[in-house]
Amino acid sequence: MTDRHSGRAHLEKFLHAHALDFEEVNETTIAVVVPGEKKLTTTASFAFGDTTVTVNAFVIRHPDENDLAVYRWLLERNRRMYGLAYSIDHHGDIYLTGRFPLDAITDAELDRIFGAISEYADGAFNSLLELGFVTAILGEW
């Protein structure tokens, strides 16, 4: 069984190998900057527990309008997603969240996790803007 220290060390090795920027938040948590195209960056935290690592990535703040349409869109996407799911906090801000066993912290799985973060945060960004911020967008044009 992998412990939190070896899981964290494996993540750090992976991040260095892939030239991803990261910082230590505390002794159990690492924040990683995932580059994107539509959404320039997504910050993801990896919090290591005794048996699992929890991933949280901020996607976008709470929608200004059409909340129900945004949340419905997120829930419909959740059915098809790998390893992560959209969630909201008490402010209505949107995150990607996931929990993985420490034994899953392999290069192949980390590649899938980072690919999922990129696809689900960056790939969905414009759709979320169009659904939840249309008035603000039109006001800027």
Model-identified regions with their sequence ranges:
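Ampiphathic alpha-helical segments that act as solvent-exposed interaction surfaces
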Residues: 76-81, 106-131
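Short amphipathic alpha-helical segments
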Residues: 3-10, 66-70, 109, 113-116, ...
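Charge-rich, low-complexity N-terminal segments
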Residues: 1-41, 87-89
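Beta-strand-connecting loop/turn residues
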Residues: 27-28, 50-51, 91-93
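Short, internal acidic amphipathic alpha-helical interface segments
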Residues: 54-93, 97
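Short, highly charged C-terminal tails/helix-capping segments
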Residues: 129-141
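Long, continuous compositionally biased terminal/linker segments
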Residues: 35-59
